[in-house]
């Protein structure tokens, strides 16, 4: 279930990235597209990088699960990271949209609400951190498996 929740978070992140990129490409301010402003393109760059990292970790956790391997550590990591990335991406997307994105009927606003609840589903971020810490500190994990 944590892998599935991580996947949902990735979907939110992808949507947030797509909305933000489209809007930044379409919106003009001070005679140029806002995607040309460093604060906007830096936000977009980090959104895409974080999306890729969380997606790859989730794929890895799913692969472990598909191969009937223990994956509670990887699933917890994927859920924790993907949820945080979804929240950050949704927040950045709303920021790029400005007050327009804050309107309740706007998709950017909806994504922020969806990203918030993803942080709670299948265990809060604090619970995920506990799961990860317990596995890392347990005798069943050695240094070789973590790196």
Annotate each language-model stretch with its function.
Residues 2-147:
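Alpha-helical interface subdomain recognition
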